[in-house]
Amino acid sequence: VHTPYENLDLIPSSTLMSQIEYELFTMIQREYVLKKCLRSIYEKELYDYVLIDAPPTLGTWVINILCAADYVIVPVEASPWGLFGLANMFDFLNGISEMTEAKIMGVLITKVDERKNYYKQTREILAGYDNINVFETFIHVDTSVEWAQDNSVPVSVYKKSTRSAKEFQQLAREVMDYGSR
């Protein structure tokens, strides 16, 4: 779907996505269906970046996304449950490492509320992981993100001056810098 925003096209998710797991289950080489679908986009160089927001599950659709990816940004909530999910994701990635060449670009700490100690604890625990990049940028809890999601607009369109809009722009610069290494 072309959007009114420069350099931004979207394929929106819908309730039909829940059928994908079922349909993939019956396919041969089901882990590579998305990669095959994206091949022509890569070959034609239509986009500089294709970002896929994966659901917080570890099923066949997520395996498809990881098999199609060159890099993975792993979001982790600044909360006790966020770290639990991160450990599960690393175990999952190790388990499918023979299927995918995706590399972890970095861990992005999200939903940071500096009134709580979780951000600091999360950062300290992540520092203990060898060879895992933790993005310098982190994303604060911000009601403007919820408003933008609810109204289907980028947060930078809703309010360019919000903290979260600036944080997402800073993250984009970090991602582009990583890609130019």
Show which residues each predicted segment covers:
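Cytosolic-facing regulatory segments adjacent to core modules
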Residues: 1-58
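Active-site donor-binding loop signature of nucleotide-sugar glycosyltransferases
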Residues: 13, 137, 141, 160
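Active-site/binding-pocket entry motifs
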Residues: 16-17, 141-145
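Short clusters of hydrophobic/aromatic residues that line enzyme substrate/ligand-binding pockets
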Residues: 24, 34, 145, 155-158
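Charged catalytic carboxylate motif
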Residues: 33, 85-88, 167
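Conserved catalytic-core segment of NTP-binding enzymes
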Residues: 39, 43-143
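C-terminal boundary of histidine-terminating zinc-finger modules
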Residues: 149-167
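C-terminal alpha-helix
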Residues: 170-181
